[in-house]
Amino acid sequence: MLENIPSQSTMIELLGQSLFEVWQALCSAIDEKYDMERLWNTGGKNWTYEYKYRRGGKTLCCLYAKSNCIGFMIIFGKDERAKFEDIRDTLSDVVCRQYDEAKTYHDGKWVMFEPTNADEFDDYVKLLAIKRKPNRK
């Protein structure tokens, strides 16, 4: 867990104003549907920060930030991959391509999106619903 949570100005400096707005919009889209614990961490060797959504010890998704770049990761387990295939026809080509190109590990398929705008957010919400039903009315 991160001791010093980055301020809004730190995030704007890191991402740039337009990507910071995308970051905020993505967080809002998730917060609107899910009441989750949110944890800041260091971003490992590839990212500056990790912002994880989890509940009951299970991770829903993670957002990552580094200089002028946002990452949005969802890990799909075996059953969740089958559910993805069930809704594939409702998703954009961009989202399907990212999914298809993602590496599958022993614990799941790690799909990293790098949004630059809100165009795919509706699809992201559908993907999150595969992981967990929204728990906000």
Question: Where do the language-model regions lie?
Answer:
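Charge-dense, helix-prone N-terminal extensions
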Residues: 1-137
